[in-house]
Amino acid sequence: MALRADQVSLIGQVFESYLLQHHRDDILGILRQGDDEAHYPVLVDALTLFETNMEIGEYFNAFPSQVLPIFDGALRRAAMAVLQAATPSPELRMKPNLHARISGLPICPELTREHIPKTRDVGHFLSVTGTVIRTSLVKVLEFERSYICNKCKHVFVAKADFEQYYAFCRPSACLNEEGCNSTKFTCLSGTSSSPSSCRDYQEIKIQEQVQRLSVGSIPRCMVVVLEDDLVDSCKSGDDITVYGVVMQRWKPFHQDARCDLELVLKANYVKVNNEQLAGVTIDEEVRKEFEDFWEKHRNNPLAGRNEILASLCPQVFGLYLVKLAVAMVLAGGVQRIDATGTRIRGESHLLLVGDPGTGKSQFLKYAVKITPRSVLTAGIGSTSAGLTVTAVKDFGEWNLEAGALVLADGGLCCIDEFNSIKEHDRTSIHEAMEQQTISVAKAGLVCKLNTRTTILAATNPKGHYDPAESVSVNIALGSPLLSRFDLVLVLLDTKNEEWDRIISSFILQNKGCPSKSEKLWSMEKMKTYFCLIKRIQPKLSDESNLILVRYYQMQRQSDCRNAARTTIRLLESLIRLAEAHARLMFRDTVTLEDAVTVVSVMESSMQGGALLGAINALHTSFPENPMTQYRMQCELILERLELHDLLHKELQRLDRLQKETYCQLQPEETSFSTITGCLNKNTFESKQKSQSEPSDQQKINSYPQPSLPKSNCEGDKHPEALRNPTPGNNISTKRLSRLNKRSDDGSLGWFDRLEDRNTDAEETFWKTSPLPKTSPDNMALKTMSKSSCSEEGNSSVPRKEDGMRGSLRTVTLCAPLEQDKVSEISSKRTEERKCFSSEANIQDPTSASASVQESVITQRVSKSLQRLHTEKSHRFFTSTQNSEANALPSVLPVSGLLDLSSDTDSVVGDENNSASAAVKHAVISMRKRSKGQAEKEAKAVSSHEPEITDGESPPAAKLAKFSFRPRTKLDDSSEKKNAEFPLFPSENTVKPGEQPQGEQLQKDCCPPEKRKMTLTCLGRKGLEKQSIGSKGNEEQLSQALGKEMGGNALIHSDVTLDVVSPPPTEKRREGEEKLGGPSTVRVCSSTLENLSKFCFASRPDSKSEAPPTIKTDTNNKESHSPLLKVHVSNPNKRKSFALGNASKDSVVTRKSLFSIAELDDATLDFDWD
C-alpha cells in the first residue's frame, strides 16, 4: 500500500514546520559548512516529533520506507527557507545532500529490540542494540542509472533494487506515456557512472550482546547496511544502537536454484554506546543513595568497603584478599596522556594462580555479570585470532572479524584456563595488554584496533605448586607476559584443618537452608556502583606518592626480587591500584590509606615480598575490626619504609576517628569509673582470648585460631602479623598515642595530672574490676604464676598483656584524659596511700618488697617524696603536703628520686621498712618508666639531669632526640669494699607481661661513658641469647653496681632491681618465699651507713653524648647494643650482671616486622645506675 498525495504533502508540511521550529540553528550550522558535496545529517528526536503530530507517528510506523524520503525532501525545503530568511552572506550556501536521522524512539517492545529482529519485523522501523563484530570495506554504490529509448528517444531513470543486492532491473517496455512499447534501451552513463548517482556504501555485522543472553544461548548476527554519512561511523568491537528499517534481500533468481532470503537492517542512524553504560541508569537518586552509605561509614570507611567486598561473589566463603583485588581491578585506574603524548593505560590486569577447586572461575563469572561490557572465554581452544582479530573471506573479499579482546574494548575480558592457550597464540596479547591496541596485517588488510580492556585471567599451576620455584616456572608463563599483570595472586590449597571445617560447614549450611543476607548488596546495586565509580577521576596526594615511590625503590633493592616483575611497570601498577582503591572508597583523592592498602595487597601478591615475603591468598577472611587491621598495616609498612612522620600523622587521624566514633556511641556524661571498668573488662577478655598461633597460609586476615595452652611458652616466630591481626584491639597503643598528642605542649603539667589521677585510677579499678579483690601479695604471686608465657622472644606476634597489668596500664594512660575530676579525688588519694602504707608495714619488709615489685594495682609516683627531697637537696620546690614524706631521713640525695617504676610502685613505705628500702635502693630499679616520669624527674634535678625534649614525633623519633647536658659525673666517696651488695631472689624478677608502649629510656644521672648501658629483657629467650657466665661474675657485678650507685643512699620502698624473668618453677619458689616471710634476709646497718656516704661530684671534662640511633633488623633477633650482660650459671639461681664490651657493634632489637605492638620497652631499657 502506498501513501496518497495528500498524505505525502501533509507529512512534508508538518515535518518542515517542525524543523524550522526546533532545528533552525542546526540547519544554519550546516549551511555555513564549506564542503557542498558532503552529506550532512540533522538529528531528529522521534518522541518530540510524535508529540508534535501523532498522525505523523502513525504514518512513520506503518510506512517507514516511504516516509523517510519525504522527510529528506522536507529537510531540503526547510534549509532553503532558512537560507532565504537569513541575512545574505557568502558563508551561507545551500547543501544538496541533507538527511534526516531519526533517533530516540520510545522504549517499547514494538520499537526497541535487544535481540536480532525476526521475519515478522520486516518493514518496521526499529532500534537494535548489538556489538560490531565485522566491518567490510567502504564501497562505491551506484544507486540509479539513466536510460534512453532507442525508438522514441525517451529518457528515464532506473533505481537500483535494494532487495536484489542493488541490481538494476531494466523495464520490460519503454515508460513513455505516449505508448512507445519499445524494448530496446541504451544506458546513458556508458562505462563510467556520474558522481551524482553514486554514494558510499558499507556493510557491517552486529551480534547480540552476550551479557543480555541466557546461559547457553549462541548470540545471533545480522547485517547492517550503512550509506552516505553513516559509513565508517563505527568499528569492530563497538557497542552500537542502530535505528533503521528491517528489510529482506535475495540473490537474483537462477533456474533450479533455491532462493535464500536474508534479513538486513537498512540503517537510518547509528549511535555508538561505548561511552555510555549499558543497561545502567545513574540519576541523582542513585548517587544520593551511595553518598548516604559512605556518610554512614564516615568514621569507619573500611567497614563500608568490606560490606561491598562481602557482596562480591558471595557464594565463595572468605578469600578477603582476592575479593579486594578483584574489586580494585574492576574499579580500574585513571587513563591519562603524559606531556609527550604517550597514553598510559588505566586498566589493571589480575592473574589468579591456584590449585583446582579454589574458586577462581567463580570470580570470573561474577565479574562478567556486574561489568556492562564483558566477554568470558576459556583458554582451551582459543586461538590468537579468537582472542585478537581474524581475517575472513566473505562474498569474495577479505574482512576482519573481532576477537574476544576487541569485543571487550572498554570493558572486561575474562580468560579462564589461561595457561591452556598455545604459546605462539599467547604472545599475541602482549600488545593488547600494555599498549591496549592490536595492530593487524592480514590478507592485505593493515589496521589498528583498540583493546582498552581489563584482563582477569585464571590459571592452574602445572602439577603441584612449588613455593620454592618462581611463579613463571610454576605456571609456565613467560616473564614478559607476567610483568603485564598488575597483581598475581596465588591460592594454595594447603592442608588446614580449621579452614576445611569452616568451608564445609558454610557449604552445607547453604545446601540445607539457603538464606539471603540483609546486608549484602544485590547484583544490580553492585553493577550500578561499579559503573558510577568509573566516572570518578582520583588525583594522587603527596603522601601516597611518597609511600608508593619508597615501596617501589625497596622492591627494586630487595634481595628476593623478581627481576622480571620489578620493572617500571610495578610503579605504574601501584599508581593504578591506588587510584582504583580510591574509586572503590568513593573518593576523588588518593590518600595515605589507599597507598597503604595497595602496598599490603601488593605484598601479598607474587610481585611483593620485599617487606613480608610470599603469602597464600586462599586462607584469608574478613577482619573483625578493619580499623585495627589497617592500623597494624600502617605501623608495619610505614615503619619498614621509614616514614615515621607519616605514621605519626596517620595514627593521630585514626585516634581522632576512633574518638569520634566513641563519642557517638557513648553519651558524654559517662563517668571515668565507667570508662575504666569498660577498659579493664576489654583487657581481661583479650587476655583470655590469648595469642593466636597463625598458620603459614594466613595473610592479611584470618579466623581467630584456638587459644594456646597456658603452659606453652614457645612463641610462633613467623612474621604473620599482617596476615593475622588479633581480633582484640590493642587499647593501650591507642591510649598512648592519644597521650602523646595531649602532651605536646612542652610543659610537664600533664605529668602532674597523670600522677594525681593514679590513685583515682587505682581506686576505680578496685571498684569496677571483674577480678576478685586480692591482697597485693597474692596478686603478685598470681601474676607470676599465670604469665610465664607472655614475655618470650615472640616479638612477631602482637602480645596481649596480662589482664590486670594491661588494664591498669590502660587506666594509667587514660588518666590525663579525665583532668576535670582531679580536685574531687585528691583527698581520697592521700587516705588510700596511707591505708596501703600501713597494710604494707604489717607484713614483713621483704614481703612488702615482693608486693611492690610484682603488684599490679596501679602506677604510684611518689611526687610528694620527690618534691620534699628535691627541696632539701637543691631548694627548687617550695613545699609538699604529703605527711609520709617527713618521716623519711633527709640524707636521700637527688639521685634517689630518679628510678621510679612506671608500672607497679604501689605501696609507699615509711620509716618502718626503711631497711628494706635501703636494700632495694642498693640494687637500683631497672623497670621501665613512662616518658612523663622521666621528664618530671629531669625537671626536678634541673641542670644535673639529662635534657629531654617532648614533641609530637612518634616514639622512635623521640628516642633519637634527647641529649645530655655535660655536667654530671657520679663519684664514689666511700671505700670500694663497701660497695658490694647481695641481690635477693625476690628482687630479680621482671613482670612477664610488662611491656608498655615503649621507647622510654631510663634517664638517670650517670657517667657519660656508661650512659649507653642497656638491658634487654626478653624473658627466657632473651636470656638464652645472652652470654652464659660463671657464678664468679656475681661479685664482679656487685662491685660494678656499687661503683655506679654513686650516692643513691636511700630510695623509697618501691625501687627494685628488675632483671629477666626466671623460669616458672623459680617464680613459684620465689612466690612461696615471699609468702613465707621469715626466710628472707635483712640488710645490716653498716651497709646503710656506707651507702649514706655516697655523694655527687661533677667533673668539667664530662662530655655529652646522645644515645645510639636504634635500628630494626628483621632478620637478626639478637640484641646488639646492651653493654650490660646477663650471666646465668644455673637457671634456678639468681641472675647477675656484668659490664660488657662497649665497643661491640650493636643494634637494639625492636618489634618484628609483623608485630602489632609498639617498640618493646625491655629491648630499649637503658639503665643508668
Swiss-Prot record:
One of its GO terms (biological process) is DNA damage response. Residues 785-796 have a biased composition (Low complexity). Residues 691-710 have a biased composition (Polar residues). Residues 302-507 form the MCM domain. The keyword Nucleus applies. The keyword Cell membrane does not apply. Belongs to the MCM family. Component of the MCM8-MCM9 complex, which forms a hexamer composed of MCM8 and MCM9. This is DNA helicase MCM9. The gene is MCM9.
